[in-house]
């Protein structure tokens, strides 16, 4: 049986700011773009969350909920430095680390000899070490599979941990709301509840064939998770799959010429970011994203071997003409999908 730990830093960006400026510790703060530029909140500390401020919330809405919110632009070099230090702490216990973002990761400690092989004690020691060396708190979940470890890490936040032993899995799943399973959003949860399916215990009584017919691939995943099945390994070789850049406008745009001008300004930044990870600029696909004034969004991609501005502009124009439907546009984004390493190797061998 595997021993998986999911470590999740507590309001990470905000925690770094409060550590470096203790005057911020007891007041509501958030990291995000300004209201004037129609930004969104990256994260908020717990005093701000008491007012309902949440990640991905428009800054304007956050300021309505909490007028005295202190808004910070973010210091991503500081967050990256702290993240690298945290990852180095992880590596003292195992080489099998799968970072999910700057502030969370999976660790497989099945074969670790630290703490007499106890995943519970390893998680506790990691959290204590992070606090000792960085003055930041972390929460952790321990379980035999990845999705349960992730759920567990949220059970005793902040600065806590929760353990689900193999023997406890069946009872834990019986009453676990389906909405807690990573990947089950509000819409899916509502559809499932309309079918009388609210917990994993409910799904355990369902016929797999019925779930496959109703939900396709998602139906199988739902059935497996409800049985406690998650065969995904902790992938220490997880690679970045895409690079993107986007801009939210202060005012909605309604004319193609405005959109084209924004693309002209975004393209050099996309090129710069891509060059950091792929100096030859070879890619699998490139595409554009438009978000409209009703917050609906659309993405259009085009297979293309190398970053190409003219093709991006042509793709954006086609998307603008066919999908806008007279709506104002509040966000324009450009992105590329990177080549799969195996595919890239095959292409090189083919030459």
Swiss-Prot record:
Could you say which EC number(s) this protein's record lists?
A: 2.7.7.7
Main subcellular localisation:
cytoplasm
What are this entry's molecular-function GO terms?
A: damaged DNA binding; DNA-directed DNA polymerase activity; magnesium ion binding
UniProt keyword annotations, A-Z: Cytoplasm, DNA damage, DNA repair, DNA replication, DNA-binding, DNA-directed DNA polymerase, Magnesium, Metal-binding, Mutator protein, Nucleotidyltransferase, Transferase
Marked site, Substrate discrimination, at 13
Q: Which residues form a coiled coil?
A: none
Q: How is the cofactor bound?
A: Binds 2 magnesium ions per subunit.
Spell out the subunit comment: Monomer.
The role this protein plays is: Poorly processive, error-prone DNA polymerase involved in untargeted mutagenesis. Copies undamaged DNA at stalled replication forks, which arise in vivo from mismatched or misaligned primer ends. These misaligned primers can be extended by PolIV. Exhibits no 3'-5' exonuclease (proofreading) activity. May be involved in translesional synthesis, in conjunction with the beta clamp from PolIII.
Q: Matching PANTHER family, A to Z?
A: DNA POLYMERASE KAPPA, DNA REPAIR POLYMERASE UMUC / TRANSFERASE FAMILY MEMBER
Q: What name goes with this protein?
A: DNA polymerase IV
State the organism named in the record.
Answer: Escherichia coli O139:H28 (strain E24377A / ETEC)
